[in-house]
């Protein structure tokens, strides 16, 4: 039916002249996307009105997959092919995740980043994360009505270079232009600071599903300065789940190794539900029937849970104390503590934070959404949509020192941790032997003094150094960190001018060949994806047209005679019956038939509206 949809002036959620950019919180447990609409940052919901997308991907045979809620619901029945908490594996080698608590996956021993074998082939954490990011990108484009110019994606402040590079690789694979990687606590501060006009020293306590960050920020007249950052990239809400999981098993006299993978996933799901219930109730039940027929039924009290997880709570306070020392402030100097991450809903966490800082934490912003909202504000700025009064300066820091290996396997730090980014620092080195014409440069990241205790980021060689006596050559090594926290290294021999450089892409990141292969794989499933999208679009349009036609019949059904009304009713019935089906062509045909069958009805309604508007008015008044 030829019905026009007209918005009031200025009421469009995103005016066409704006460049559409979003903020994405790629979380361990849940992910979400937000955008600035009508000058207000808001999280974008899916078709069912749900803002949070579970960070879960299930791979099916023959290239199919389920993402988000559907995958989460099927995790217990197919645990080996359903990847959860993939963020914990980003930028990590097999040796670093082999002991991942109760993970039912088959990890593949491959160079660089760990990979997981599924029924659809071997998948890297980057590929899994890309599925989640692509889903959020599609949600944003559907909601905002146009393509995105880019996204600000948040990462834990304590993510190292390898993990940050892996995140950018995933975004690239998902078809997203990354405007910036933004530290999660900093994003939260942007959302909180701009929303409340806050000034002073603030601590951002960020406990997500898989990572913990503590940042000390100074907010002064639109300047967001990160004074210090600390944390643990292997500590999060999942660890609280696993402690309670082990407790329930111990009480039942069972061991995780003896359980079937589907029972492990089912029990973990029930335990997580009990943990969440304890945030609002003094006790919760865990009731599970295992595949063996055995039943587990236990009552967990809030006090029992608090005692059980106390060691994990204390683990968060270690980086907190360290960050305060680095910032040269005390807990008493902190004006407010912002909580970020769903895990901060636990009373045991809120009580510990309140006790340590001597004040109740700030909880007026949704801890699940605040990071994405801050990222959306930053994305809107970077996209060029800033309006008067929106000026602010963001001064972030690197979480770990960057250095170079020197003789004896020692580390010489070039850029110390908590340096404000972007930053460039240089230092001069010399040759060790007479006649030395080349120098191997090994880039490392970490706080330890020995190379063996730090993370290796890259190696390259500077060749063509003129032969000189040992100590005569002057090699200037420059480290440059961009706003995303990613590193480039340049080396130059001062006498001859020979130079070499490397953009650090860690061994745990992806090479261009890997990206190309993954893109090729995505092309193979593109046809399936497009068919699914076409079907969904056809169903939505059919539903819209049915509802619009029925509303028009209620309002102006008297404009049709009995025969015409019967024809329209039949077309509506036909389309309503086809709409839930999976034949997009049939739905499109029925939609077209109803639209054409109501053209005359639409024209009569238009005539009626015009006559009503002109009734009683003279020609010179029109």
UniProtKB/Swiss-Prot annotation:
Keyword Cell membrane (UniProt): no
Keywords associated with the record: ATP-binding, Chaperone, Nucleotide-binding
GO MF annotations, alphabetized: ATP binding; ATP hydrolysis activity; ATP-dependent protein folding chaperone; unfolded protein binding
InterPro entries (UniProt xref): ATPase_NBD (IPR043129), Heat_shock_70_CS (IPR018181), HSP70_C_sf (IPR029048), HSP70_peptide-bd_sf (IPR029047), Hsp_70_fam (IPR013126), ISC_FeS_clus_asmbl_HscA (IPR010236)
Keyword Isomerase: no
A Pfam family hit: HSP70
Matching Gene3D superfamilies: 1.20.1270.10, 3.30.420.40, Actin, Chain A, domain 4, Substrate Binding Domain Of DNAk, Chain A, domain 1
UniProt GO BP: iron-sulfur cluster assembly
Family: Belongs to the heat shock protein 70 family.
Biological role stated in the UniProt entry: Chaperone involved in the maturation of iron-sulfur cluster-containing proteins. Has a low intrinsic ATPase activity which is markedly stimulated by HscB.
Record protein name field: Chaperone protein HscA homolog
High-level lineage: Bacteria, Pseudomonadati, Pseudomonadota, Betaproteobacteria, Burkholderiales
UniProt gene name: hscA
């Amino acid at each position: 039916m030829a019905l026009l949809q007209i918005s009031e002036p200025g009421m469009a959620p995103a005016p066409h002249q704006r460049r559409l950019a979003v903020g994405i919180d790629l979380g361990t447990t849940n992910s979400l996307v937000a955008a600035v609409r009508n000058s207000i940052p808001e999280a974008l919901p899916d078709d069912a009105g749900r803002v949070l997308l579970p960070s879960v991907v299930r791979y099916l045979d023959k290239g199919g997959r389920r993402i988000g809620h559907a995958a989460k619901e099927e995790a217990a029945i197919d645990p080996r092919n359903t990847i959860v908490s993939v963020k914990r594996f980003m930028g990590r080698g097999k040796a670093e995740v082999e002991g991942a608590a109760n993970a039912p996956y088959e990890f593949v021993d491959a160079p660089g980043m760990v990979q997981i074998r599924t029924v659809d082939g071997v998948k890297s954490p980057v590929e899994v994360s890309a599925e989640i990011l692509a889903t959020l990108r599609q949600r944003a484009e559907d909601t905002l009505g146009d393509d995105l110019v880019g996204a600000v994606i948040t990462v834990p402040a304590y993510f190292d270079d390898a993990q940050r590079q892996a995140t950018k690789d995933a975004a690239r694979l998902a078809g997203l232009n990354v405007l910036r990687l933004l530290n999660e606590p900093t994003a939260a501060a942007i959302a909180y600071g701009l929303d409340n006009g806050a000034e002073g020293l603030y601590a951002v306590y960020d406990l997500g599903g898989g990572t913990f960050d503590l940042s000390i920020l100074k907010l002064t007249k639109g300047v967001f300065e990160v004074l210090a950052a600390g944390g643990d990239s292997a500590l999060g809400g999942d660890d609280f789940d696993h402690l309670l999981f082990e407790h329930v098993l111990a009480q039942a006299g069972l061991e995780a190794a003896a359980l079937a993978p589907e029972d492990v996933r089912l029990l973990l799901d029930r335990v997580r539900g009990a943990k969440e219930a304890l945030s609002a109730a003094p006790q919760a039940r865990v009731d599970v029937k295992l595949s063996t027929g055995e039943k587990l039924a236990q009552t967990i009290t809030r006090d029992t849970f608090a005692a059980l997880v106390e060691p994990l709570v204390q683990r968060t306070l270690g980086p907190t104390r360290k960050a305060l020392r680095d910032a040269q402030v005390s807990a008493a100097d902190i004006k407010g503590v912002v909580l970020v991450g769903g895990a901060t809903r636990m009373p045991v966490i809120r009580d510990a934070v309140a006790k340590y800082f001597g004040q109740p934490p700030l909880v007026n912003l949704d801890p699940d959404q605040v990071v994405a909202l801050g990222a959306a504000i930053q994305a809107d700025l970077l996209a060029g949509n800033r309006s008067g009064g929106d000026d602010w300066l963001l001064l972030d820091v690197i979480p770990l020192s960057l250095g170079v290996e020197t003789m004896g396997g020692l580390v010489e730090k070039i850029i110390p941790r908590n340096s404000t980014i972007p930053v460039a620092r240089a230092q001069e080195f010399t040759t060790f032997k007479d006649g030395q014409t080349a120098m191997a440069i090994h880039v490392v990241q970490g706080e330890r003094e020995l190379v063996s205790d730090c993370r290796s980021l890259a190696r390259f060689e500077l060749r063509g150094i003129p032969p000189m006596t040992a100590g005569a050559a002057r090699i200037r090594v420059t480290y440059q960190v961009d706003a995303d926290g990613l590193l480039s290294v340049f080396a130059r021999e001062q006498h001859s001018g020979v130079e070499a450089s490397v953009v650090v892409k860690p061994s745990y990141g992806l090479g261009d060949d890997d990206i190309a292969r993954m893109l090729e794989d995505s092309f193979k499933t593109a046809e399936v994806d497009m068919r699914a999208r076409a079907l969904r679009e056809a169903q939505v349009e059919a539903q819209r047209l049915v509802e619009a036609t029925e509303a028009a019949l209620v309002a102006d059904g008297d404009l049709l005679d009995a025969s015409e009304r019967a024809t329209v009713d039949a077309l509506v019935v036909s389309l309503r019956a086809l709409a839930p089906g999976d034949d997009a062509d049939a739905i499109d045909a029925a939609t077209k038939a109803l639209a054409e069958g109501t053209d005359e009805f639409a024209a009569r309604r238009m005539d009626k509206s015009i006559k009503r508007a002109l009734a009683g008015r003279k020609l010179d008044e029109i």
